[in-house]
């Protein structure tokens, strides 16, 4: 089974990068990562271009015309080729086993939902790549 991850983002490359660090450290790597971009600017585009060298990323973008997250998510779904899709946001850093657990628990015809642990903002801001790797 192939796994695709759809990450929604809007104008926050610092948070998006922290999330991408997590996808570099997966026990079971994503077959595709689609960044559903609700109209971010040049800084986000440049970050995504940098990470395309490290991860199988597709950047699905539309012009900023207000909050249209659902529209860009639908476009990302259309762009996806994976058998199984995981949806997340730019500020959700996955555990190293996040995709491996999805791979283990996925069953045809079922929807799998999970939770998250919300870190205090001060800790989230201080999070560095080595924290995610370790």
Predicted regions and their residues:
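Conserved donor-nucleotide/metal-binding helix-loop-beta segment in metal-dependent transferases, i.e.
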Residues: 99-117
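Cell-envelope/extracellular polymer assembly enzymes that use nucleotide-activated donors
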Residues: 2-4, 32
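Short beta-strand-to-loop element that shapes/binds the nucleotide-sugar donor at the catalytic cleft/hinge
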Residues: 112-130
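Short, acidic, metal-binding catalytic loop of nucleotide-sugar glycosyltransferases
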Residues: 21-30
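Short aromatic/hydrophobic "clamp" motif used to bind/position activated sugar donors
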Residues: 85
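Short beta-strand/loop segment that forms part of the nucleotide-sugar
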Residues: 30-39, 60-62
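Glycine-rich, basic loop-to-helix element that forms the pyrophosphate-binding segment
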Residues: 63-80, 97
